[in-house]
């Protein structure tokens, strides 16, 4: 397995995702971003130094919601932005922790979401209490239940990932996908898609095989696409053991570029799986499936396409080279920790 290559080429997945409609950007982005930044900044000030705060501002985390929820109202978009800011901050914070400390942080989140009178005085607890009061209480009962379950799964998963990083443990492909599905933050983003559509799907829809097929295809596409973009940053941090590229290189015994190409091919298959699920559900006689469930899968497809588009609009992955990388697809791998802001700087 050749790992010495210092340049790799990203696939053009926007061509693959061109089968999904382009619904543009949400028109409420500018106003909602100001509101969401003002809210999350009080927690950034506690956790991040000025260099990291400047870096995260350049990443334009709120912009991803304008790409992925173009149909959302101002109220809905604000909810998605607050969630995005929580997820990015929590992800950066737990990346610096040991497996034990990440597990302890997860326990605080879980107790805060499940025990309404819990307050240990920590910034994590207060951030989640704020989000619950401002947003979760407004969700429908099914979306609310799933959101809390999914968020708890996500934070538990950060502890698991941290333990894998500590041990340099690389899963096989199937085990990796199962782990990511079970504990992906994208699950919570999909829950908010339901809310923004004004839909509260009954659980039997989420348990339907055709819906599961489309839902999982969209979920896999989002985190695999993200793995492609984040690989260079993660290898520079020493965190690439929990990235599909490392997983594929080890499992298939292939080189770096071949792993990118393999993953791109898998994404093409998943795209067709998502489309097939929409067609299947649209043929049902029950409007809960033929209308509401299809709308939710369309929103998931929008998430896939929008997330891919945002990844080149942000400086999150390639810094000031983002436009050049979009044009050339060439990524020159960074040396360890080069240009990576440290949390407390």
Swiss-Prot record:
Needed co-factor(s): Mg(2+)
Record EC number: 4.2.3.-
Molecular function via GO: metal ion binding; terpene synthase activity
Binding site residues for Mg(2+) 2: 91
UniProt binding sites for Mg(2+) 1: 91
Record GO biological process: isoprenoid biosynthetic process
Domain of life of the organism encoding this protein: Eukaryota
SUPFAM superfamilies, alphabetized: Terpenoid synthases (SSF48576)
Motif DDXXD motif mapped to chain: 91-95
Signal peptide positions (record): none
Pfam family, one: Terpene_syn_C_2
Catalytic activity field: (2E,6E)-farnesyl diphosphate = beta-gurjunene + diphosphate
Keyword Metal-binding tagged: yes
Function recorded in the entry: Terpene cyclase that catalyzes the cyclization of farnesyl diphosphate (FPP) to beta-gurjunene.
Protein name (database record): Sesquiterpene synthase GALMADRAFT_104215
